[in-house]
From Swiss-Prot:
InterPro entries: PEP_carboxykinase_ATP, PEP_carboxykinase_C, PEP_carboxykinase_N, PEPCK_ATP_CS
Annotated substrate binding sites: 61, 195, 201, 322
Superkingdom of source: Bacteria
Record organism: Rhizobium leguminosarum bv. trifolii (strain WSM2304)
Source species taxonomy: Bacteria, Pseudomonadati, Pseudomonadota, Alphaproteobacteria, Hyphomicrobiales
Name of the protein in question: Phosphoenolpyruvate carboxykinase (ATP)
Metabolic or biological pathway, per its Swiss-Prot or TrEMBL entry: Carbohydrate biosynthesis; gluconeogenesis
Length: 536
C-alpha cells in the first residue's frame, strides 16, 4: 500500500482494517485535492476557480437510511422513537463488507477536529473514496495545526464509500444506501450516497450524543457576537432566516449551523460553512456569493453554463444546491470560533398561518416549550393547487440529528438559560395580515429592527402585553417599527378568521407536545399555548 502525506504512523488505516487499499493520501491540501478530483473525473473547475461536483441520485440527506447501533451502552440512552436501531451483528457484517470493498482502492484521509473548545473537541478522521469529499470535509471541520498531525489520534472515524451498495437482507438496513453510527466505538459507515452533507451531519450526531453527558449543550443554530462580547444564538429550521439574520456586518460570526454551550461559553463545532446557493445573488448575500467565486470552495450540484460559470437560479439538478467553504472565507468570521455565554437566544419560526407576532419574549419555561416544539410552517406545493400551510414540528430545531431524548436537551438548555440569565425571544419571519395566500411576508426590515432592539437591550424598556393565544409577552411599540404588525390580529381584515386560525394552530401545538408531557415539569407544561400568562 502506497502512502502519501503527513500522518501518525501509529494510527495508519491498517489499524482499522483498511490495510488492503491501493494507496492512501493523508491530509492533502486543497490544491492537491483539486488535482486529484479533476484527474479522476469526479469534479470540474469553474471559471472563477471553485470546484463543482455532482452527487447523482442523492442530492440531500437520506434520513430513512440512517441507523444507530443498539448495544448495552446505547440501549437506554438513545431516543429510539426517532432513531432506527441496528444490531451489533449487522453492523459487524456491514463493516467487514465495506472494508473488503475498499481493498484495492485509492483512499483519502483528513485528520480534523469537531469542536473549537479544546476540552470538548472530538478528533475526527474522515476516510473517503472521493477526493472532492476529502476537500469538502477539510473545508467544513476544524483543521489542526500541521505540527499536530504526526501525533493525531482520532476518537471518531468516518468511512465514506459512495460506490458501496448495502444489502438490506444481509446488513439489516432499508436500501442500498446506509449511514450507520456505532456510537460506542466511534465509527460511522456511509455507503451508497455521494451527498457530502452526510459526513458533516454524522459528526454533529456523534457530538449530540457525547456532549450532554459532560453537561455541554449541543445546538443546531447559528451564532454571532457583538463588539462588547454580547453573544447571540439563533435557533431555526430551514427557511426561517437563521443564516441571513445571523450575518450582521456589525457583529462577528461564530458559525452558521452547529454549536456547543459549555461551562466556558459557546463554541462552533465546525471550521467552515455549508450554505444553500439556490437563487444566491451578490446583492442579497454578498459574503456568501463571494465565496463561490474563488479557489477552495466546493460547489455541490450547482449548474454551470457553457463558460463554466455557476447559474445559481437553475435548480434543475436539485433545489438543494450548496457551497462548502472554510470559515476564514467570510470577512467578519471569528478566528477562534468561541464566545462567552450568550446574552440572547433567538428562536426563529416562519409562521405561514399568520398567527404569531413578529417578536415575543419567552420565560425559561416558555423557551424550553418552544425549543421542544421546534415549530415552523412550510408553504404547500403550488403544483397541487393547495394554499393551506403545513405545520412542521422538528424538536430541538433539529430532530434528525438528536440521538438522545429531546427532554434531555431541553432540560439542559433551560438550566443554562436560568443559570446565566439569558434573554429569550421568539421571532416570526413568516406571514402577517393573513395566512400564506392572503397575507404578506413579514418585512425583513421590520425583523432586523426588532432583532437589533432585542440584541441591544432596547426592548427591555418598552411596554408589553400578554398574547391571548400563546401567553408570551409581546411589545406594544418599538422605535422604527410600525406598531400595527406587533399585534397580528389587528393586521387581519377578518378578525373571526384570525381567531379560528389561531385556535387551529394552538391545537396543533398541543397535539404535538403531548409526547413530551411526561418528560417535563409543571412550569413547562404551563407554558403551553392557551395559558395567558406573559413573561415578567
Amino acid at each position: 500500500m502506497e502512502m502519501f502525506g503527513v500522518h501518525n504512523p501509529a494510527t495508519e488505516l491498517a489499524t482499522v482494517g483498511l490495510g488492503g487499499a491501493a494507496s492512501v493520501r493523508y491530509n492533502f491540501s486543497a490544491a492537491a485535492l483539486y488535482e486529484e478530483s479533476i484527474r479522476r473525473g469526479e469534479a470540474e473547475l469553474t471559471a472563477q476557480g471553485a470546484l463543482r461536483a455532482i452527487t447523482g441520485q442523492h442530492t440531500g440527506r437520506s434520513p430513512r437510511d440512517k441507523f444507530v447501533v443498539r448495544d448495552s451502552n446505547t440501549d437506554g440512552e438513545i431516543w429510539w422513537d426517532n432513531n432506527k436501531p441496528l444490531s451489533p451483528e449487522h453492523f459487524a457484517l456491514l463493516r467487514a463488507d465495506m472494508l473488503a470493498h475498499a481493498a484495492g482502492k485509492d483512499l483519502f484521509v483528513q485528520d480534523l477536529i469537531g469542536g473549537a473548545e479544546e476540552g470538548h473537541a472530538l478528533p475526527t478522521r474522515v476516510v473517503t473514496e472521493f477526493a472532492w469529499h476529502s476537500l469538502f470535509i477539510r473545508n467544513l471541520l476544524i483543521r489542526p495545526d500541521a505540527a499536530a498531525l504526526p501525533s493525531f489520534a482520532p476518537k471518531l472515524t468516518i468511512i465514506d464509500l459512495p460506490s458501496f451498495k448495502a444489502d438490506p437482507a444481509r446488513h439489516g438496513c432499508r436500501s442500498e444506501t446506509v449511514i450507520a453510527c456505532d456510537l460506542t466505538n466511534g465509527l460511522v459507515l456511509i455507503g451508497g450516497t455521494s451527498y457530502a452533507g452526510e459526513m458533516k451531519k454524522s459528526v454533529f450526531t456523534v457530538l449530540n450524543y457525547l456532549l450532554p453527558a459532560k453537561g455541554v449543550m449541543p445546538m443546531h443554530c447559528s451564532a454571532n457576537v457583538g463588539p462588547n462580547g454580547d453573544a447571540a444564538v439563533f435557533f431555526g429550521l430551514s427557511g426561517t432566516g437563521k443564516t441571513t439574520l445571523s450575518a450582521d456586518p456589525a457583529r462577528t460570526l461564530i458559525g452558521d449551523d452547529e454549536h456547543g454551550w459549555s461551562e466556558n461559553g459557546i463554541f462552533n463545532f465546525e471550521g467552515g460553512c455549508y450554505a444553500k446557493t439556490i437563487r444566491l445573488s451578490a446583492e442579497a448575500e454578498p459574503e456568501i456569493y463571494a465565496t463561490t467565486q474563488r479557489f477552495g470552495t466546493v460547489l455541490e450540484n450547482v449548474v454551470l453554463n457553457e463558460r463554466r460559470e455557476p447559474n445559481f437560479d437553475d435548480g434543475s439538478l436539485t433545489e438543494n444546491t450548496r457551497c462548502a467553504y472554510p470559515m476564514d472565507f467570510i470577512p467578519n468570521a471569528s478566528e477562534t470560533g468561541r464566545a462567552g455565554h450568550p446574552k440572547t437566544i433567538i428562536m426563529l419560526t416562519a409562521d405561514a398561518f399568520g398567527v404569531m407576532p413578529p417578536i415575543a419574549r419567552l420565560t425559561p419555561d416558555q423557551a424550553m416549550y418552544h425549543f421542544l416544539s421546534g415549530y415552523t410552517a412550510k408553504v404547500a406545493g403550488t403544483e397541487k393547487g393547495v394554499v393551506e400551510p403545513e405545520a412542521t414540528f422538528s424538536t430541538c430545531f433539529g430532530a434528525p440529528f438528536m440521538p438522545r431524548h429531546p427532554a434531555e436537551y431541553g432540560n439542559l438548555l433551560k438550566e443554562l438559560i436560568s443559570r446565566h440569565g439569558v434573554e429569550c425571544w421568539l421571532v416570526n419571519t413568516g406571514w402577517t395580515g393573513g395566512a400564506y395566500g392572503t397575507g404578506k411576508r413579514m418585512p425583513i426590515k421590520a425583523t432586523r429592527a426588532l432583532l437589533a432592539a432585542a440584541l441591544t437591550g432596547e426592548l427591555g424598556q418598552v411596554e408589553f402585553r400578554a398574547d391571548t393565544n400563546f401567553g408570551f409577552a409581546v411589545p406594544v411599540s418599538v422605535n422604527g417599527v410600525d406598531s400595527s404588525i406587533l399585534d397580528p390580529r389587528s393586521t387581519w381584515a377578518d378578525k373571526a378568521a384570525y381567531d379560528a386560525q389561531a385556535e387551529k394552530l394552538v391545537s396543533m401545538f398541543i397535539a404535538n407536545f403531548a409526547k413530551f408531557e411526561g418528560h417535563v415539569d409543571g412550569g413547562v407544561r404551563d407554558a403551553a399555548p392557551g395559558v395567558k400568562v406573559a413573561a415578567e
